[in-house]
Structures are given as C-alpha cells and as structure tokens.
C-alpha cells in the first residue's frame, strides 16, 4: 500500500509467485476443463450449485444408510424432520447464497465428506466391502484437495471400523487385510498427487 503497487488479497507471495491455500481439486474438476473447452472462466456459482446438490443427495443417502443400519423402521416424517435441519445447519445454504471463490472448495469438501461416509457405512454391511471402502476413502482423501482442514472428518473411521478390524480381529485375516489396504490406499495416492503438485509449483 505504501508504494502503490498492485497486489492480490488473501494469497501468499513467495519468490515472485502468488500461492493460494485452497486445494487444487476445484480447478481440476471445473475451472481447467471449462477453460480448455471454451477459453472462458468457469462460472463459480454453477460449481457451488453442483456441489450443494451433491451434498444434499449425499446427506440423504447417508441418513438412509444410517437408519437402515441402526433402526428397523423410520417414518418419512421423522426422516425429513432430521434431514431438513441437518442440511440447514451444515452451512450449505449460506454457501449457496454467496457462491464465491471461497465457497466452492468448502461446498465440494462437504459433498465429498458425506459421500465418503456413505460409502464407508455401506461397506460395513456388504459382502464385497473392499469396493465401498475404496470409494469411501477416495472421497475422504479428495477432501484434502478441496479444503485441507476437513481431513478431521476422516477420524470418524476409528469409531466406524475399530470394532470390526481390531476388536473382532478382522484385520488379521486375508480378507480383512485386503479391505484395510483399500481403506488406506486412496489416502496414499491422493497425498502423493498433492505433494507432487506442490513440488511442481
């Protein structure tokens, strides 16, 4: 400000380059493909809308899976009574109302989180759990490429899987070991990709 030089807000400047702290996944999913196809900037509001819809669908699927796993019957009225405030309290309505550059990584991280939890829960009651675990962990790992702080939701894996893998010693069986690898592998792959990206830039 003192010298009158132009600068960008809320970014880091290091050795002649600007850096943002948000993950790169929104760029890879929306901005870059749209730019390559049209030569124009991607409308951020559309991306936020897509992420919001994905979140609502995901939270609905997650609640349905949770209800089926823990309760025999849940009325539609009770389901909606729980779903509506859950969506309202998630912050998604605020993100939809203000679809800015800041909103998209957060909305996308929330969407990947609920779908990741859904896949994990589905895997717990499936004979072919490895595929569900793989999909769930991929979603949860991709959260880091959107909004890194949301990786804390991955800690829910401990209460979800501790009994099966540790208490019941499923981890020490060939099938359990394969499933456990499917839970961990996506994190390793996504982490390697993010580290390579950071090194390249």
Predicted region positions:
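Juxtamembrane segments of multi-pass membrane glycosylation machinery
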Residues: 8-50, 68-73, 95-99
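Transmembrane-helix signature of polytopic, membrane-embedded enzymes
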Residues: 59-91, 111, 126-135
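Structural signal for the C-terminal ends of transmembrane alpha-helices
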Residues: 63-68, 120-125, 159-169
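Specific aromatic-rich, kink-prone transmembrane helix
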Residues: 107-126, 135-140, 154-157
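Perimembrane helix-loop-helix junctions
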Residues: 152-187
